Amino acid sequence: MRAIYIISVIIVSLSIFSWGGNARSDYPWAMFALRLQWPAGFCEVNNACDTKSLLNTFTIHGLYPYNAKGTPALYCDGTAFDVNSVSDFLAEMHLAWPSHETNTEDIQFWEHEWKKHGRCSEALLKQTDYFRTALAFRKAFDIVGLLNQEGIYPNNDLYRPKMIKEAIKKHLNAVPEIDFTKNENSEYVLTDINVCVNQQATRFVDCPTDDATDDYRLKFVRLPSKMKFADPRTNSII
């Protein structure tokens, strides 16, 4: 019963950012995937990690249009990135969509994601709407909270990939996709989770999935906790 209640609450939250309308047959993209990044996982497998941005929450990696065959849209023609398009909600962008790479500023990261994926959605979502939608999409649910309710915590424990996916599916009524990378010890570390909605963003749908990520039957993926680093400004542990 609680799961049904949670799904209902999430659907209401989803409707807040839905652009609605009828599905457009002339529009090549059938769904959108919000790619969420786990900062501690990213930083464990990337040397050029900006430790200032480590948070115990998932941050936005990107918003990707997919066609009906499950192929993401890449590098379409369209307008150039304009930072003024996010000026009204710039502070929220820095918090929710930060770059975790030391050599990439937040604005550079947004520009890259717009060029790589965002422009492909421009017939439906103009630049400002694209970024607003990603922010609202992220706020429609709490991945960490949903996982915690199913006994999955970012505490460096090992979990089967299917267990993580089933935990999220229980609450969103749709299958997510997870991504993981090997660290220097050849352990699989969770770095990203995709959550998908239909073209009009009125309901969650199953994400395109790579069967290989489901069928690491003898493998486990580790969900790192927030790592501790010395803050050079205060020499204290953060």
Swiss-Prot record:
Residues 1-23 form the signal peptide. PANTHER family: RIBONUCLEASE T2. RNA binds at residues 37, 61, 109, 112-113, 116-117. CDD domains: RNase_T2_euk. Root. It comes from Panax ginseng (Korean ginseng). The keyword Disulfide bond applies. This is Ribonuclease-like storage protein. It comes from the Eukaryota. Homodimer. GO terms for molecular function: nutrient reservoir activity; ribonuclease T2 activity; RNA binding.
